[in-house]
Amino acid sequence: VLIARRSKKDYQHFHTFVFHEKYPVAKDGDKCAGWAEPGGTIQQRWESTRCGMSDGIDNHNLTLHEFGHMLDYRDSDFDSVPHFDSKAARLQYQLFLEEEYADICSAWEKKTGNEIIRKYATSEKVEFFSCVTEAFFERSEMVRFMRRDLYDWMVRIYQMDPAKWPERISPAELQDERYDQWSDWMRRSTWQSKNEEM
């Protein structure tokens, strides 16, 4: 989903996906469900990955979250500002982000009932874009209703509008779609992982 409408250049720095049977241990010694590294590696606990994919409306999807980080890492700033082709658009988004992030942090502090973006987004600004990505795809109608300006920015960033999607499809239907489209996608794609180039 995250690469469907954006340039493959957004992920050209990504090269390795590691799944762990148990909770992986980060460099600081903490166990966590997963993380994305600026150098191009994503590490995730398999069960957390599976659970996130099996429930499309719980606002928790580890894979969407970590790939959101990877998208943010393209410009090496780690600031919840993904790549924009236009410098003017990037500046507009940065100004919007400052206000929106402060407002969501305040909403969580005051418990105003407008916390559609999960609290983890307020722990560090670098987590904001990834948590918003999860909400955008898993609770799109709620984000559009409660945070319309933020939703409109995400539509612009991902170039899709999930609140308008007619319905969710089952895992079996998605798998059929993958099989039907895979050969054509591979034929048209110029993207290859670093592993394939080695």
Where are the regions that the model predicts?
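Extended cationic-aromatic binding surfaces that line active-site or macromolecule-binding grooves
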Residues: V1-V25
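Short glycine/proline-enriched turns and hinge-like loops at secondary-structure junctions
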Residues: Y11, S54-G56
